[in-house]
């Protein structure tokens, strides 16, 4: 059974902190064994579905990593990949202890639906600890272009 490490998130927008986690995943799990899963989160603003699909294609091509958009519960995506013959490992990126507390709580919800889930937490490098998609969106709302240095050019 082949291992597939899945890095899920809304990635709205995908930034250099996310890229740092993807780089770590490739070192740990190996090229060809990782996937980015972009979840459509109803509580987070998304422009439109076609734009999201186009961005995911560009991201996949740029990183040379499969990117899949899903609009189901995360455990359902994991079960789908397991049914395709993969041993799935869920990868969660962390910036700090607050993220760990949040992710631990989210994992409890996921385990209410799927008990046997493998999770790896990867901490980003210190230089990326302050970067978040929500902070980038806030910067951009005040002055478009002000957060460009944090974004991955897709």
Language model: regions and residue ranges:
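Nucleotidyltransferase catalytic core that binds NTPs
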Residues: 1-154
